[in-house]
Regions:
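Extreme N-terminus of proteins, especially the signal/transit-peptide cleavage junction
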Residues: 1-7
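Alpha-helix termination/capping residues and helix-transition junctions
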Residues: 3, 31-33, 53, 78, ...
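Residue-level signal for beta-strand positions within conserved beta-sheet cores that form or flank
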Residues: 5, 32-35, 154, 173
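The start of beta-strands in P-loop NTPase/AAA+ ATPase cores
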Residues: 6, 36, 58-59, 82, ...
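SAM cofactor-binding core of SAM-dependent methyltransferases
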Residues: 7-66
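Class I S-adenosyl-L-methionine
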Residues: 71-81, 91-281
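Non-cysteine beta-strand/loop elements that form the S-adenosyl-L-methionine
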Residues: 85-87
Length: 282
């Protein structure tokens, strides 16, 4: 599957533009070409950041996707586009949450994607979510998602990817779902291994910052406000207490996943802590 034309792109659940940034890097490095024609995001501050980072003039501002998809006519008026991307809300599938899946309103956002897909029929779809989506509810949730896409006429492939395999030194597993209206060649492979091989082949001509370990990323001069106090340090670095046992480790070359509750300062078995000596090393 070789695509040489400019692809029209719409980004759903855009946040501050994760997919868009990737598309822009591919364009900058002359690997692929994209034109962004619209985006949806409900968080006001995320939208402010998105508009500050990108030139969104003449793009469709879809806003709240629930409200937007209430009108088939409104969906139909979207400009035609080739690629739909979206990291739909993951809290209802995450191992860190209650895992209510489709029983939570946020878990139903996938079906708002399908509302757009059934009207606009974009040739390509790329969706992202937490690894646990793949196994949630004994895989019934994931199977439903794949079946919905197939029922809309799409060929669907998927795999689980880890950021540390792509020169981003953090353990962060995500399931990526690729769907296309085009027939897939018999030799088409969509897997973490195949994509990693493609990345390795192209990375020398990619301008994105790359690092195999956190040493290449951590700032050398760290403000005092980020230092652990002597009072809290023994607790955070301890291997456990009466009701909680753990193996606390600092100076991880590959960072642990970031969590929404990390600001609460978990123990060193969960969060990422680094010594000044480690930061200063090469």
């Amino acid at each position: 599957m070789i695509i040489r034309r400019t692809l029209q792109h719409i980004e759903l659940f855009a946040g501050i533009g994760g997919f868009r940034t990737a598309m822009d890097i591919l364009g900058r490095d002359k690997i692929a070409r994209f034109k962004h024609v619209g985006y949806s995001e409900i968080d006001r501050k995320a939208v402010q950041t998105y508009c500050a980072n990108y030139d969104t003039e003449n793009e469709v501002v879809m806003g709240d996707i629930v409200h937007f998809t209430e009108s088939v006519e409104r969906i139909g008026k979207l400009p035609n586009f080739d690629l739909l991307t979206g990291g739909f809300p993951c809290q209802t599938f995450s191992m860190m949450g209650h895992q209510r899946g489709f029983d939570d309103e946020r878990g139903l956002m996938f079906f708002r994607i399908m509302d757009i897909v059934r009207v606009k029929h974009p040739p390509y779809i790329l969706l992202e979510n937490v690894k646990n989506l793949y196994t949630h509810d004994k895989r019934r949730t994931f199977t439903r998602i794949v079946e919905e896409l197939k029922a809309a006429g799409y060929n669907v492939v998927y795999d689980i990817f880890n950021t540390q395999d792509f020169c981003l030194p953090q353990t962060r597993n995500r399931v990526l779902i690729f769907a296309t209206l085009e027939p897939l060649p018999n030799n088409f492979i969509f897997s973490s291994k195949a994509v990693k091989e493609c990345f390795e082949f192209n990375k020398s001509r990619m301008s994105v910052r790359q690092s195999d370990t956190v040493i290449g990323i951590l700032e050398k001069n760290v403000p005092d406000k980020y230092m652990l106090s002597e009072r809290i340090k023994p607790t955070l670095l301890a291997d456990g207490s009466a009701g909680f046992k753990s193996k606390s480790e600092i100076n991880q070359l590959i960072a642990r996943p970031l969590t929404a509750s990390m600001h609460k300062m978990h123990r060193a078995c969960q969060d990422n802590y680094y010594s000044l000596d480690f930061i200063a090393s090469d």
